[in-house]
């Protein structure tokens, strides 16, 4: 029997986000959710490489903590992984806006990041984080204040440090999305915006990017292209996430002008 959060994939897709559902997600959970009151943000503190290396642990749990450990995972490339439609063990003891039953009333999002300065958050991932949270809060009809970080919820204060970014700024971005002020990032006047490219993309823009990087121009963003993109990003001191967004396009334009 499916649990209650079967609306999650459609809500995220409606916000223009990339979504992958995991096998068995509809019936996965430690019982059903209560009334969904908000969203709790986490980071995985996992490996330095890979798009979503902690997916298995989040899905199946650890020896000391039964899974699922959140309803959603968020990869470094901005992909949402729908893991569970039921309750997950992500919150623990704490309090936010009067809610003390985090596992029952908050949807958990585990975003892939080590949570240290050496692992900066990719722009594409942070944009997806804000948009995904806004999509969920809009669906349940509450404001941005009902998004909290694990570090804000957990008691005693200081028990948790995730997520590593500033939650006040994050909520401001979510609030802007909810009010329609910031539905999508706007390019500067005179810019010619180009879409974000990631593994799986195909077409003329992929060929253009491959030419800039000295790669065979087959127009397919596969693993070899991703590896070259990561190496270029690292050389340019950008987040080496293998995703070509606004900053990477600007760096490519500057390097190969």
Task: Label each residue range with its predicted role.
Residues 1-20, 28-33, 100, 107, ...:
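Basic/polar, cationic surfaces and motifs that engage anionic cell-wall
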Residues 1-102:
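N-terminal catalytic cores of peptidoglycan-degrading enzymes
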Residues 73, 108-110, 216:
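Conserved beta-strand segments that form the floor/walls of ligand-binding pockets within enzyme
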Residues 75-77, 218, 241:
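Acidic/polar residues in short coil/turn loops that connect beta-strands
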Residues 176-223:
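Acidic, Ser/Thr/Pro/Gly-enriched interdomain connector segments
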Residues 206-209, 221, 232, 238, ...:
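Fold-core signature of tandem repeat domains
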